[in-house]
Amino acid sequence: MDTFDAIYQRRSVKHFDPDHRLTAEEERKLHEAAIQAPTSFNIQLWRFLIIRDPQLRQTIREKYGNQAQMTDASLLILVAADVNAWDKDPARYWRNAPREVANYLVGAIASFYGGKPQLQRDEAQRSIGMAMQNLMLAAKAMGYDSCPMIGFDLQKVAELVKLPADYAIGPMVAIGKRTEDAPGKRRSNSPGRIPLGKLLCLTKVWCLAI
């Protein structure tokens, strides 16, 4: 599928076939696509929890979100990020670079992130978002649909899955075969989309009022 087709056809689907399963190769392809997303200094701080256990998925649905896709989608992925990945053996992120380049960048990582917890958290969420978009567009290109979800108790779910304390929790992503059509998007100003002209600022200083 053409990249632009995947972008415009991707919708947040709520209803999935609970009996459909992805093959191991399809899952691998999705995960490989997700980790091609860019990260600052190539830190690759995203982490993906594949929630397979039916009872765990049912518990999450019943107690912390009540969204059908939590149990019905073929895949339920909790996307998180290691906030301290910048300080965990950073040389590995540049192991294939020339030594001079690697030494410089490893030092720059420490200088850029050290002692800046807010920046570290912000970077975690930025990285989560870019990986999620890769994941959802890859799913669309493979003929599947997806739904990003934030409508759940983040703290309770983090505790339930024993997420490490130094990880930032992000949205969940449901992926699978849809059973109902979602409203379409057009390449023009589709219903609900703010017109492009109100989102672009073409002057030297900020000019947007909305």
Swiss-Prot record:
A single GO BP: response to herbicide
Family membership noted in the UniProt record: Belongs to the nitroreductase family.
Presence of keyword Flavoprotein: yes
Domain of life assignment: Bacteria
Protein name: Protein DrgA
GO molecular function terms listed in the Swiss-Prot or TrEMBL record: oxidoreductase activity
Source organism per UniProt: Synechocystis sp. (strain ATCC 27184 / PCC 6803 / Kazusa)
Pfam families: Nitroreductase
Cofactor: FMN
InterPro entries in UniProt: Nitroreductase (IPR029479), Nitroreductase-like (IPR000415)
